[in-house]
Amino acid sequence: MALDNKFVAKGLRLYSARSVANRTKTFVAKKNKVVAPKKVVAPVTPVEKTFGKGKRVIAAKASKFAPSIPAEIRSTAAKKVQQKVALRKSITPGTVLIILAGRFAGKRVVALKQLDSGLILITGPFKVNGVPLRRIDQRYVIATSTKIDVSSVKVAATINDAYFAAEKKSTTKSEGAFFSDEKKAEKKKIADSRVADQKSVDSAILAVLKKEKFLTVYLKTKFYLKKGEFPHQLKF
């Protein structure tokens, strides 16, 4: 018996599809499943034709849309192209930045250059406020109007994105380490080359800071908001 499932609104019926199935018991009727026969691909056999006194094998006919030269077949795989990230106009080499998030939040640092990945290479200097050479995204910094002349600061070409790549740790553990209850935290040892790079960059920046009277104290001071101060009303 058919169920009168009339429209109660535009595009909306009185009963849902499940309600109609439960009321009419249409799910009880078993439908015969039609199994489609599998297509058997016939093997391609070479065709031999007689031309005059001799015989010749006819080559298999290529597809109508197949390229005549195999070299023209191109891969459909997408090529990964790293687009250059545009840096804000307020951020230039020597600009003093305020870090907004992370371990060094609130610290004032000096921007050195933009790396190929789009991240900014910064330094404290380390001797002034404890911020070493590191990368940071421009969305996590505020550019101030204070600028330092870093034309005399030479950053080595080796200090790039690969310079800051993390070392892969081995996941395999020995039997003794697996069953040991005590876990000793190993202190990460800084490479001598990194220490030398930090000292060379810091020494050049410190020479520039000595020329300005309160610039070293300014970089040492941590940024924070006082009561009644709002960041959108401040001029950095």
From Swiss-Prot:
Signal peptide: none annotated. One of its GO terms (molecular function) is RNA binding. GO terms for cellular component: cytosolic large ribosomal subunit; extracellular matrix. Keywords: Ribonucleoprotein, Ribosomal protein. InterPro entries: 60S_ribosomal_eL6, Rib_uL2_dom2, Ribosomal_eL6_CS, Ribosomal_eL6_KOW, Translation_prot_SH3-like_sf. GO terms for biological process: cytoplasmic translation. Belongs to the eukaryotic ribosomal protein eL6 family. This is Large ribosomal subunit protein eL6. It comes from Dictyostelium discoideum.
